[in-house]
């Protein structure tokens, strides 16, 4: 069973007279244990696709379902709880709390989710895996772009969501760190049985993906690795 499914999604911006059609009848699903890439050129609507999938933005028509439950049928409070407890976001804006040190970012997640004390062993392992153990006492303003991105990834994964939605998570990383992030997402999907959806234009992640979709001219289609490498 799909953990998340988009059915006949259409998204328009603008008025009826000057309407921009971003998505045309998008159908997409992800199962637990899968790492899925969604690729496409700049301006193709990849980020809009991700925010619709995560319930941060509503489609003009169509539905989003999480394990068979239509998100539109939920109350606002239920949708908020769904995003808080079931979905982990890694967005391009990072959204780190500027006045909290790196280690405090994770304590903040625990407080928001009301999970009690932080699991220091789990956190230490995650920070080491991402190569950011030495950053725990730094503020976001003291981090490089790549460091900030890795902290944002760690924070999303530490919350232990069922679904991870990542928007260009390797944009500020070198090839070595890209491979580390790819392996981390792959491990998260396979060993922790999560559904991981990564929106990217970074073909270096193709080696780690179970499936790759392309968004082009508002439509989505499944592509094989060889097709994408030949582009």
Task: Please state what every model-predicted region is.
Residues 139-143, 147-149:
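Conserved ABC ATPase signature
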